Amino acid sequence: MLDKLSNHIGRQLQQARQRKGLTQAEVAKRAGTNTNYYAKLERGEAVPSLKMLEKIVKALGVKSSDVLPF
């Protein structure tokens, strides 16, 4: 289940980032994290905390409901 969640979140983050025309480094900087961690999120290798997810969706200019499957 966690793999499914992390993969879903990763795909949604990547799509949102690409729609905005941003690089992973730009999103990571805006969210206050490092590029390697953000890249892991997009690949589905990590699940962000709610606090980090809040920062990332703000950096992307989307809502958390756009990223989460529920």
Regions found by a protein language model. Give the residues of each.
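DNA major-groove recognition helix of helix-turn-helix/homeodomain DNA-binding modules
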Residues: 51-66
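Short basic helix-loop element that most often maps to the first helix and adjoining turn
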Residues: 11-29, 55
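Short alpha-helical DNA-recognition segment
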Residues: 21-43
